[in-house]
């Protein structure tokens, strides 16, 4: 078994992160903002961040909770304020910058007396991401037939120098069609070479070949092709023995040989005459070599070009004759002269092709062969020649044909044809991708392809360029990337030489120099020169103040782009941009999938420490802005500006999405809350606009993020939980442990190896439920493994790693579910979520069937008191434990007694050690809520039967035995806090007192002299908690009372009773009172009083209970125990569940659990069951349960426990009749939880109560004592039945007809008929709102004279009434208007 019992500390992530912040993160931020200037730069604030100190907290944790204060430390830094003009120090001293909330040992923060948790956030990691563009419209091909065929010429024709045809050849110039012009070429002396003829001839031959579409087309094409290549020589008869592959090989290398001969002139040496060699000295006049690149010399004159050109043309004529003689007589093997003078055959040619093409061939004896006429360099030279057009002699041109939309010819130069051809082959069918660069700070930068129909400054192979690469820093601002690089000072030559796919951006290889006269400066990019700052906003991307990749961003970019830059370079560099462009083009050609943004290698966790560090950065940035904008403020005022940092921190802890009120329902919920990972929050995802892909489970989540535990509803998949063994590394990536497997043996010595998601993809990893023998060798022949996010089977020798535990995959809450591999995932999700909602019971039990994690969850939950050091217990009481450590010091541990948790459950510690007991460090000293004897115990083991009972368990309802009520099986304690504010201002002055007029003695007997209820009092609804009175004003008194006071001169004014009473439906016992005093020297006055009331809640109809497998239900009836079905030994069943709740929900784990539970109950034994036990054999769970049931049956001599024909089913007897039920029934001990959805908190009734001020409709909700809304769908139901009068009542007197409802109340009290209803208030509000937008609506009353005549009378519905009291004047003429 590959199970590791020592799981890591469950809240280590939070604690380690906060400690890192205090030790290093805070220091980094203080160092970054060590010098701050005011607006005039005269005053400098200097923070000595390295010397900061933390002052001990004012309040302890317990006291901070009691007094609703913060548990925080003062951050003190030496501050120096210096006047730079006078060079004098105005202020120097220890300055308290902020009160920093301090983390408790249980990884929580106490803010305003409440425990809060900072949830870790999972966000996209800084780095570079490539994704495929969706819905990108592919450009339409230009459908001219000529153009289409011409573009394919390159694959068939030799793309060498175009043929120069001597005039005396037997075939005369070609004539194609009537409309096409024709040309004959005879002149060798013209500098402008006309290759029109070549184009036509090539096209004609190609068309002939392409028409052959029948069966042996390949052979025929090649045959025709070779025939044409022979020109007019005797037909080339190849032997039939050559197969197709040899022929195609021959054809492919034909082009290559041809180019080779002409371009590099590997011919016999004797054929070269001295006149055709150019001395190196002459070469130097044209070119100078710089950095291994040919570069034009500025002094090179145009006359030399003419001379060279004429030389060239003589040479071409000479070469043509040589080719005729040498090449066609010896086709297969052409003798080449190399330095070694060896014969080069076709195979070595294949290797030759892979070498880079060079534009100049330097040979020995200091002479250079003329090989650069068509190199890019000379082509550039020709551009600068004056255009001198001379018609060729003896050439006739009729109607020149435009093959392309632009007037360029199909083939201009040898390189053009070659590059265009390779460009199309390489890039024509490319896909479009976008690269997104996410820095640590700064906006995202996008690189992508964009259509641009303008001809660009730099030369492109296609004139109408549609695939320009642009850089974009926001939705509007964008620019072609090459423009940006040129603006930043790079030359074309540098850009080209740094790009792997330079041919995508540059048609020909650019020169280093831009012109013949002026020298181009080399790029010297200096960020601090003002010129570059003013170029454009894009220059900011190289500036660390605006764009900062950070440590993680640099690490990710280096990994993704295979760069070897130093990890401390936190800015974007040219190398990054070149690598991004290369990667974009490579992806476009290869059409591979883009990056998976949901992969955990591309997402990282920001924990408490990093969130606080970012918070300090934001605070200091606000401070810098504030000091920079303040003018002529006093020094003290400017120093007080530092409060803005404290305000930032308070704002984060108080109202951030990631700072949450801690879930303290039970120990499990509080532990899970601290291990939660949220995708929401600042910088995270937006819940409303998120896709399903982001919420989905990803293969890389394995062992890192739990696939089961996530909330139901809108946050599903966005909020997750760490798995049991996962941890977060220094860079924020989640790691999970594995054992190494070498040659089929699991190596378990030392610690397991932690792997991140990106490394894991390269190894074959086996799951934990693979059986091993005693020597740790894998025993199966075929083992299922994960490899590169796929699932394959391999032999044991190919396995690299194996998971350490079967529960490594799931979170802490899910790992508590036994047999969860038999449950459907949705039900397991509900099970793990509902365990977090279970209320700690007064008498809880450990589960009979557990999973073995209960002890560690109890230790790490923070709800118990753990020993800080080893020693011997000195004394134990209910309130404290004193431990004498071996070092001699005595430690006093104070226990919490009946404290209120955030969810109003009860936190109470009970000691479980005895005087004189030896204890170890970290051992649990007390039980806490939901913890019994060192183990988590959230519920009770109760006897359940799966059977229907009179319809009382229809649709998940639950029937329970009254034993659960009387024996306090599901009884819990809840503590509520009531805050009573004492108002003290100029108008109103409240006093608290016991002397309240007009009250009986029984009503005030439980108040003390201050008027506060005494401890231990049992209070019911309406009882006074705090007695308060307020003096009446004169205006409030009746006239006769004023008269009497004036006559008899009464000294005391009347007082009004404003005492705080228990709300309706609430009861309990007063367990604590806390008073808060005003900070006044004059008198001892209370400001606020808190009263804590504990109530014992037994289980009742309407409460929600659930199992651990997502089987939840509401209690529908509590049956007397004598009516419950009972077992043959007389034990009545505690709970009856509906058997139909199992098959459709597919949570069969509950049956396994309850059957093993009854076996354990009878055997007096508890079981720890790990999931995924199929490694020991098929159906092991079922076999184990049958064995244990049989064993229990034998040991207890109770044969009815195990029936081999229907194992797990027992005979039940009906408690009402005493007869057996017809069929055996599944009975067992299930572990059931009482959930916090209690009926006491939800039950609510209202007769009359408060109304909304404007619409005058009743308020909603229990807290406002509101009514029950009769909503839209309920109205449809009444409309469907035509219940008109019921509807009318609901719309008027039961809702917002103010006058009508008062009159109705009077009528009901007096027993009179209910009067007609009036106009609803909301209708009047609608009228007023329509008037506010300029629509004047009037209401009219229709009066009938007789059947045919009537007249209309306008009625003003908006009566004048006292707006404060909203009461009508007594005279109203609306009696007869009805709605």
Swiss-Prot record:
Q: Cross-referenced Pfam families, in alphabetical order?
A: RNA_pol_Rpb2_1, RNA_pol_Rpb2_2, RNA_pol_Rpb2_3, RNA_pol_Rpb2_45, RNA_pol_Rpb2_6, RNA_pol_Rpb2_7
Tell me the InterPro entries matching this sequence.
DNA-dir_RNA_pol_bsu_ext_1_sf, DNA-dir_RNA_pol_bsu_external_1, DNA-dir_RNA_pol_su2, DNA-dir_RNAP_su2_dom, DNA-dir_RNAP_su2_hyb_sf, RNA_pol_bsu_bac, RNA_pol_bsu_CS, RNA_pol_bsu_protrusion
Q: Where in the cell is it found?
A: Plastid, Chloroplast
A GO term for molecular function: DNA binding
Q: Which Gene3D superfamilies match?
A: 2.40.50.100, 2.40.50.150, 3.90.1100.10, DNA-directed RNA polymerase, beta subunit, external 1 domain (2.30.150.10), DNA-directed RNA polymerase, subunit 2, domain 6 (2.40.270.10), RNA polymerase alpha subunit dimerisation domain (3.90.1800.10), RNA polymerase Rpb2, domain 2 (3.90.1110.10)
State which Enzyme Commission number(s) the record gives. 2.7.7.6
Annotated Gene Ontology cellular component terms: chloroplast; DNA-directed RNA polymerase complex; mitochondrion
Keywords for this protein:
Chloroplast, DNA-directed RNA polymerase, Nucleotidyltransferase, Plastid, Transcription, Transferase
Q: Which GO terms describe its biological process?
A: DNA-templated transcription
What reaction does this catalyse?
A: RNA(n) + a ribonucleoside 5'-triphosphate = RNA(n+1) + diphosphate
The UniProt family comment states: Belongs to the RNA polymerase beta chain family.
Q: Supply the NCBIfam families for this chain.
A: PRK00405.1 (NF001616)
Quaternary structure and interacting proteins, as annotated: In plastids the minimal PEP RNA polymerase catalytic core is composed of four subunits: alpha, beta, beta', and beta''. When a (nuclear-encoded) sigma factor is associated with the core the holoenzyme is formed, which can initiate transcription.
- Reported function: DNA-dependent RNA polymerase catalyzes the transcription of DNA into RNA using the four ribonucleoside triphosphates as substrates.
Task: Give the protein name, as stated in the record.
Answer: DNA-directed RNA polymerase subunit beta
């Amino acid at each position: 078994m590959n199970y590791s019992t020592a799981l890591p500390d469950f809240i280590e992530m939070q604690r380690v992160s906060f400690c890192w912040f205090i030790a290093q993160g805070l220091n980094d931020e203080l160092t970054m903002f060590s010098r701050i200037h005011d607006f005039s730069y005269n005053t400098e604030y200097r923070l000595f961040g390295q010397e900061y100190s933390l002052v001990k907290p004012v309040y302890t944790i317990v006291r901070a909770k009691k007094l609703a204060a913060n548990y925080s430390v003062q951050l003190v830094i030496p501050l120096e304020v210096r006047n730079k003009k006078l060079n004098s120090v105005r202020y120097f001293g220890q300055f308290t910058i902020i009160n920093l909330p301090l983390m408790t040992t249980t990884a929580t923060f106490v803010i305003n007396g409440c425990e809060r948790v900072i949830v870790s956030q999972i966000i996209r990691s800084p780095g570079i991401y490539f994704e495929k563009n969706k819905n990108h419209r592919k450009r339409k091909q230009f459908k001219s037939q000529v153009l289409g065929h011409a573009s394919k010429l390159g694959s068939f024709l030799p793309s060498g120098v175009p043929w120069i045809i001597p005039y005396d050849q037997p075939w005369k110039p070609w004539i194609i069609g009537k409309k096409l012009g024709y040309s004959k070429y005879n002149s060798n002396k013209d500098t402008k070479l006309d290759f029109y003829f070549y184009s036509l001839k090539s096209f004609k031959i190609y068309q002939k070949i392409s028409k052959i579409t029948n069966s042996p087309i390949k052979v025929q094409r090649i045959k025709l092709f070779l025939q044409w290549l022979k020109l007019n020589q005797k037909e080339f008869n190849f032997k039939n023995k050559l197969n197709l592959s040899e022929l195609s090989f021959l054809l492919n290398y034909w082009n290559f040989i041809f180019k080779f001969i002409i371009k590099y002139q590997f011919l016999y040496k004797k054929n070269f005459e001295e006149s055709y060699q150019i001395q190196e000295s002459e070469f130097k006049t044209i070119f100078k070599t710089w950095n291994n690149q040919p570069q034009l010399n500025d002094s090179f004159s145009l006359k030399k070009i003419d001379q060279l050109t004429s030389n060239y043309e003589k040479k071409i004529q000479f070469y043509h004759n040589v080719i005729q003689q040498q090449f066609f007589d010896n086709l297969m093997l052409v003798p080449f002269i190399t330095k070694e003078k060896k014969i080069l055959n076709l195979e070595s040619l294949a290797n030759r092709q892979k070498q880079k093409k060079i534009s100049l061939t330097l040979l020995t004896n200091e002479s250079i062969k003329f090989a650069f006429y068509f190199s890019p360099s000379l082509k550039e030279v020709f551009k600068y020649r004056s255009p001198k057009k001379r018609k060729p002699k003896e050439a006739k041109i009729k109607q020149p044909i435009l093959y392309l939309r632009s007037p360029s010819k199909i083939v201009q130069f040898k390189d053009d044809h070659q590059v265009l051809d390779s460009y199309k082959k390489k890039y024509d069918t490319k896909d479009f991708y976008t690269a997104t660069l996410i820095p640590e700070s700064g906006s995202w930068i996008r690189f992508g392809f964009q259509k641009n129909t303008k001809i660009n400054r730099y030369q492109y192979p296609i004139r109408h360029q549609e695939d320009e690469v642009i850089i974009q820093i926001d939705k509007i601002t964008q620019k072609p990337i090459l423009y940006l690089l040129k603006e930043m000072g790079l030359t074309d030559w540098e850009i080209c030489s740094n790009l792997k796919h330079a041919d995508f951006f540059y048609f020909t290889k650019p020169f280093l120099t831009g012109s013949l006269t002026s020298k181009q400066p080399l790029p010297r990019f200096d960020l601090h020169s003002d010129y570059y700052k003013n170029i454009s906003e894009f220059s900011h991307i190289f500036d660390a103040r605006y764009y900062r990749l950070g440590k993680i961003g640099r690490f990710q970019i280096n990994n993704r782009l295979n760069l070897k830059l130093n990890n401390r370079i936190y800015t974007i560099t040219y190398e990054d941009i070149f690598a991004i462009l290369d990667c974009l083009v490579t992806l476009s050609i290869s059409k591979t999938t883009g990056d998976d943004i949901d992969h955990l290698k591309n997402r990282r966790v920001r924990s408490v420490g990093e969130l606080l560090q970012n918070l300090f950065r934001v605070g200091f940035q606000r401070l810098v802005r504030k000091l920079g904008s303040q003018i002529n403020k006093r020094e003290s005022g400017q120093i007080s500006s530092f409060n803005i940092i404290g305000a930032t921190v308070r704002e984060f802890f108080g109202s951030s999405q990631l700072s949450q009120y801690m879930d303290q329902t039970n120990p499990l919920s509080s532990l899970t809350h601290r291990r939660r990972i949220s995708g929401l929050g600042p910088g995270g995802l937006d819940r409303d606009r998120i896709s399903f892909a982001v919420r989905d489970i990803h293969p890389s989540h394995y062992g890192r993020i739990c696939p089961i535990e996530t909330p139901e509803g809108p946050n599903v998949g966005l909020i997750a939980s760490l798995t049991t063994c996962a941890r977060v590394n220094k860079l924020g990536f989640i790691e999970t442990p594995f054992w190494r497997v070498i040659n089929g043996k699991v190596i378990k010595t030392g610690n397991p190896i932690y792997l991140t998601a990106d490394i894991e993809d390269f190894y074959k990893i086996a799951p934990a439920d693979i059986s091993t023998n005693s020597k740790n060798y894998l025993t199966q022949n075929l083992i299922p493994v994960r490899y590169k996010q796929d699932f394959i089977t391999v032999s044991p020798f190919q396995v690299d790693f194996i998971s350490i535990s079967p529960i490594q995959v799931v979170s802490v809450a899910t790992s508590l579910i036994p047999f969860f591999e038999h449950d459907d995932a949705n039900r397991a999700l509900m099970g793990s979520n509902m365990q977090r909602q279970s209320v700690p019971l007064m008498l809880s039990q450990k589960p009979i069937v557990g999973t073995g994690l209960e002890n560690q969850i109890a230790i790490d939950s923070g709800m118990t008191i753990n020993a800080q050091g080893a020693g011997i217990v000195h004394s134990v009481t209910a309130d404290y434990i004193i431990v004498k450590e071996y070092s001699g010091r005595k430690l006093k541990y104070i226990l919490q007694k009946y404290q209120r948790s955030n969810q109003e459950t009860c936190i109470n510690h009970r000691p479980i050690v005895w005087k004189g007991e030896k204890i170890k460090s970290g051992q649990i000293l007390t039980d806490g809520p939901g913890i019994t004897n060192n183990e988590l115990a959230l519920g009770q083991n109760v006897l359940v039967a799966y059977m229907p009972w009179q319809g009382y368990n229809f649709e998940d309802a639950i029937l329970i035995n009254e034993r659960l009520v009387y024996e306090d099986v599901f009884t819990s304690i809840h503590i509520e806090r009531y805050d009573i504010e004492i108002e003290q201002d100029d108008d109103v002055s409240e006093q608290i007192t016991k002397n309240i007029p007009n009250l009986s003695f029984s009503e005030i007997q439980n108040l003390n002299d201050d008027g506060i209820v005494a401890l231990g009092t049992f209070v019911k609804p309406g009882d006074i908690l705090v007695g308060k009175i307020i003096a009446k004003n004169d205006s409030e008194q009746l006239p006769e009372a004023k008269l009497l006071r004036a006559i008899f001169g009464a000294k005391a004014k009347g007082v009004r009773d404003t005492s705080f009473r228990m709300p309706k439906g609430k009861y309990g016992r007063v367990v604590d009172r806390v008073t808060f005093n005003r900070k006044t020297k004059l008198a001892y006055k209370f400001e606020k009083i808190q009263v804590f009331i504990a109530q014992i809640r037994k289980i009742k109809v309407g409460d929600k209970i659930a199992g651990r497998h997502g089987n939840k239900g509401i209690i529908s009836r509590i049956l007397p125990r004598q009516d419950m079905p009972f077992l043959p030994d007389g034990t009545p069943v505690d709970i009856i569940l509906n058997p139909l709740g199992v098959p459709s929900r597919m949570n069969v784990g509950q049956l396994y659990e309850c059957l093993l539970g009854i076996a354990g109950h009878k055997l007096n034994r508890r079981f720890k069951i790990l999931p995924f036990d199929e490694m020991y054999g098929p159906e092991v769970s079922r076999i184990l349960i049958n064995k244990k049931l049989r064993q229990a049956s034998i040991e207890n001599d109770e044969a009815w426990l195990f029936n081999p024909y229907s194992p797990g089913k027992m005979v039940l007897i009906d408690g009402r009749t005493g007869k057996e039920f017809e069929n055996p029934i599944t009975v067992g001990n299930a572990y059931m939880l009482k959930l916090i959805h209690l009926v006491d908190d939800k039950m609510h009734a209202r007769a009359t109560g408060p109304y909304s001020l404007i619409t005058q409709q009743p308020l909603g909700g229990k807290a406002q004592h509101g009514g029950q809304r009769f909503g839209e769908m309920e109205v449809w139901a009444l409309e469907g039945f035509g219940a008109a009068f019921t509807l009318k009542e609901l719309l008027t007197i039961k809702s917002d007809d103010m006058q009508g409802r008062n009159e109705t109340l009077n009528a009901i009290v007096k027993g009179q008929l209910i009067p007609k209803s009036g106009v609803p208030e909301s209708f009047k509000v609608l009228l007023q709102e329509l008037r506010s937008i300029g629509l004047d609506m009037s209401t009219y009353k229709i009066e009938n004279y007789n059947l045919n005549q009537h007249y209309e009378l306008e009625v003003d519905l908006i009566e004048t009434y006292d707006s404060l009291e909203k009461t009508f004047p007594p005279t109203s003429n609306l009696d007869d208007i009805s709605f």
